[in-house]
Amino acid sequence: SKKALENDKNVIIEKPITANSKELEDLIETANKKNLMIFEAMNLHYTPAFLSLKEDLKKLGDIKIVSFNYSQYSSRYNTFKEGNILPAFDFHKAGGALMDLNVYNIHALIDLFGKY
């Protein structure tokens, strides 16, 4: 992403946008200096179902507890069990369940209920 920005390209980035906030700040600074755009590719927030959910939640009143779960079996899991840690499972490379799947939950929760 940084190389694309440095070469005067607008960038759409697949999740996770970066591994940490420092990296994100660096990308934003580079984009701003060059008057370029960076976008995170997650589009859930713009689907009709999500927009409807967001409106319907307002009718329920004060929400006390929310539980989100998103899981799936990975076609790479057998490789992982054999000891070969691919990037999707390597937290040193912004992988692992939190960054690979649960980032969807976090994005949705923040959009629906705000930051606390």
Role assignments for model-derived ranges:
Residues 1-45:
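Beta-strand-loop-alpha-helix segment that lines the small-molecule cofactor/substrate pocket
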